[in-house]
Amino acid sequence: MAEIPTWTPVVALALTDSDGRLLLQQRPAGKHHAGLWEFPGGKVEPGEKPRIALVREIREELGLEIDPAALSPALVTDETSDRAIVLFLYTATEWLGNPQGREGQEWGWFTSSEAAALPLAPMDRDLLARLPL
């Protein structure tokens, strides 16, 4: 009997401001790919819907409130050589609050060319290259 594949569902957000800049955060020390920049997001908990997981993660990480209905599915990328995950990227242009690095992470607003010049996590680099901006 074949084994059931094991992979971790992850959600991330390409949040764009009125100037067309993307919000990215830097992975904190002690985490996988520490120091690399990424789209904010995180793991989907068992039984949790992806949009709800993303709203929760954005609130926990950045203190922002996002309406799940304002999230648009954009791209999917799958496992890299070092991780068996499937990452679902959503886009949004509306939120409430001011970003704060609630987990000690650095964050910033970047144009797509500025973002491409950052040391990005591998899956995030793939997503950025394919994101229609």
PLM feature spans:
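Conserved N-terminal beta-strand and adjoining loop/helix that marks the start
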Residues: 1-22, 43, 74
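Residues at secondary-structure transition points
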Residues: 4, 31, 41, 45-49, ...
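Conserved Nudix-box catalytic region and its N-terminal flanking loop in Nudix hydrolases
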Residues: 21-61
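A short coil-to-beta-strand element that immediately follows conserved catalytic motifs
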Residues: 65-75
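NUDIX/MutT-family hydrolases
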Residues: 89-91, 99-131
